[in-house]
Amino acid sequence: RVVSVGADTWGVDYVLMSRKGELLGLPYAYRDARTQGEMERVFRKVPRARLFEQTGLQFLPFNTLFQLLAHQRQHPDVMATAHRLLFIPDFVHWALCGSEVAEFTIASTSQCLDAQQRTWAVGLLKKLGLPVKLLPEIVPPGTRLGRVRTSVAARIGLEGWEVVAPPAHDTASAVAAVPTADTGKLTWAYISSGTWSLMGVEVTRPVLTARALEVNITNEGGVDGTYRLLKNIMGLWLVQQCRKAFEARGRTFTYPELVQRAGEAAPLRSLVNPDDP
């Protein structure tokens, strides 16, 4: 019998809310170009190595840290008005039960978290001029957040259900579902394929070495106190964009048709590195 509900989503994106619980505008998608140049501005204040040593996250221009800096530079009035930042799954939980927390695995995608302390990197954020008052309490996956609001339950048929935070980052949930008993051991690896392909291993402490920085890998939160040491690899987004481009030209293909045509095409006629900036 199903008795609880929780949400997981992609990482890094967020909403800003007022003290009255109102959305201060719609959330930006992480592919929005507003973060251009933010990473370089940060490195002028905090060396790249120091930032990795504290946050353990690979450097991607859409990390929440760079999104927030862009938000503050472009819309300082909104940032000044904001009372709370909620990541997308945390916002769903708020809509369901009114909780204002950040589940650990989704918070770990932000580059605003101290990887070793598992708390917000307050000193770093203050140095960069970001308002730490926006940041909610961090809770581990499995935390009971409350009952579904009566008004919501009546509309969607969840009377009596409890909201429980899952690993709210979708990859963390996927890795948690791997059928192994060797939690946190280097006896297995995973590839989670979707818009992105995430390849990595599960470890018990973040890997913050110079070599990890050099190859730009990331330490994201997992379940049971683990970390997901992984690399972001461009995934099926390429196929999605190909299909979209074909449709714009009046040619509609299903995904199985695209796979079939790709298999029939002459191999290695072109070589594209989708991660080349």
What are these regions (language model features)?
Residues 13, 109, 189:
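Conserved beta-strand and immediately adjacent loop positions that scaffold enzyme active sites
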Residues 5-10, 141-142, 193-196:
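Glycine-rich beta-strand-to-loop/alpha-helix junction loops that act as flexible
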Residues 32:
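Carbohydrate-associated surface elements
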Residues 36, 43-56, 61, 66-101, ...:
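Active-site core segments that coordinate phosphate-bearing ligands/cofactors
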